[in-house]
């Protein structure tokens, strides 16, 4: 019987490919953002008449340079807007709309979809069981014009998740645990398929975090096998009915088991995503700035946890909080999370990638220590090359903001 990866490709190709095969696939969705969109459209222009295969299958979002921090960024946005208007693309999200990956997850991604976008964290949509894969500008331009592009069929790797999250542990810690076990290139050439033993114990927001950070693991894709949580999410968020197919277990090149109860809050210390330690091992490291947000941890439950911690007082470190989409921002406001964060001294804004890539809205200075819920911590990632970046879950990040140093977040989540 097929694995989930094989099942998706069989439906697309009408045949069963083997790992390593180079195949042409018709995508269900193609996306790009402001930082990559300029290059995508340049390539599209070089191919002759500027046109797309299906306007309804294209998603464009301004997120990396949003709102534009430089004149050049503003020029890029003007250029992209002109093309979006000329092409008549309906799924366009201008400044304030949110981060591309979150928008795709909220509004468009479906189980069994094949999604290609011009960004490495396209994998995020694997949270709902889509084969979502990042590509370069040339390949995305070809997909936009021709309605198809090539992909190497990855080998399937199975991960079984058992148990429930203990207090203070979140999807980010599952991702960091996998990075510690397999390294930053451990899943190169693999499509990771995650089976959750107790689906309701692993919410969609946490699934999105793990899928997002599979990029850091080298995975071509990471997909949570659709279950009742997937179906509930699609019904609640979009009013779409979905019944997960019943598949017999397929054959995997390897497998690994994660026991959630055995995990604790983790951090990735400078300067590598797989330099993973328990948060308690680095307690006391003084922190200058905290960032809660990004396509990794900018969802509603992330801000609920951050608010639970920061309601205890005013942050001692600079704190920047950025919901990943307008929808998350609005809901966080309605539930009072934004009020708690601003009272704690956090600077809050609409969805932007700015601090994550060291572009704007929170660039780190020389020697500064940053705790962030984003996905990368190599030298210079969030600003000055002499800054130090720790990756953490939202509870750990919020506790670091509150105390001005890294601490174990679990005591701060007690009632």
Swiss-Prot record:
Keywords assigned: 4Fe-4S, Amino-acid biosynthesis, Branched-chain amino acid biosynthesis, Iron, Iron-sulfur, Leucine biosynthesis, Lyase, Metal-binding
One GO term (biological process): L-leucine biosynthetic process
Name of a matching Pfam family: Aconitase
Names of required cofactors: [4Fe-4S] cluster
UniProt pathway annotation: Amino-acid biosynthesis; L-leucine biosynthesis; L-leucine from 3-methyl-2-oxobutanoate: step 2/4
Enzyme Commission identifier(s): 4.2.1.33
InterPro entries on file: Acnase/IPM_dHydase_lsu_aba_1/3, Acoase/IPM_deHydtase_lsu_aba, Aconitase_4Fe-4S_BS, Aconitase_4Fe-4S_dom, HAcnase/IPMdehydase_lsu_prok, Homoacnase/IPMdehydase_lsu, IPM_dehydratase_rel_enz
Cofactor note: Binds 1 [4Fe-4S] cluster per subunit.
Domain of life of the source: Archaea
Chain residues that bind [4Fe-4S] cluster: 295, 353, 356
Record-linked PROSITE patterns: ACONITASE_2
Reactions catalysed, as given in the entry: (2R,3S)-3-isopropylmalate = (2S)-2-isopropylmalate
PANTHER family: HOMOACONITASE, MITOCHONDRIAL, HOMOACONITASE, MITOCHONDRIAL-RELATED
Family the UniProt entry places it in: Belongs to the aconitase/IPM isomerase family. LeuC type 2 subfamily.
Function: Catalyzes the isomerization between 2-isopropylmalate and 3-isopropylmalate, via the formation of 2-isopropylmaleate.
Quaternary structure and interacting proteins, as annotated: Heterodimer of LeuC and LeuD.
Identification of the protein by name: 3-isopropylmalate dehydratase large subunit
Name of the coding gene: leuC
